[in-house]
Amino acid sequence: MKRALWFVCVLALSAMAAGPLRAQNNPFLGTWKLNLSKSKFDGMPAPKSLTRTVAAEGAGATYTFTGEDADGKAIEYSFTSNYDGKDSAVTGSGMPGGADTVAMTRVNSNLVRTILKKGGDAIGMSNTEVSKDGKVSTVKLGGVGPDGKKFNAVSVYDEQ
């Protein structure tokens, strides 16, 4: 009986330790600053500044974006995703294309694919990749804005 109880305790402790280990293996976590000189925006204005902060949250992560758009207005939006392809609500303002939900899927350890949606309809897609050394994150984004015009961007972020 004591041996069975000990075994159950070891299993429980192992399960609790697995969460932080999974988070440590997520190269997307951290604070990332947009490098405007290495980024390109087509069909949409480049922001004056943008910082992406990614924090572990359960099986996934919470993404928070803050900065200033081309007109000097504040950008501040966030969402939490488990990388399971399910819709996650976006709160705040400044999300590309006016998206109100995102559906994120982890393609591999360094690549996440995101579908941007507005009112349940897909309006864009992005692929976010972290370099092997973990110092650069590149977001390739394409979609259609609220005005019906196509937009594309390659945003390069440096890890802080």
Where are the regions that the model predicts?
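Hydrophobic small-molecule pocket/channel-lining residues, especially in calycin-type beta-barrels
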Residues: 21-160
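Bacterial N-terminal signal peptides
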Residues: 8-16
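Bacterial N-terminal signal peptides that target proteins for export
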Residues: 1-9
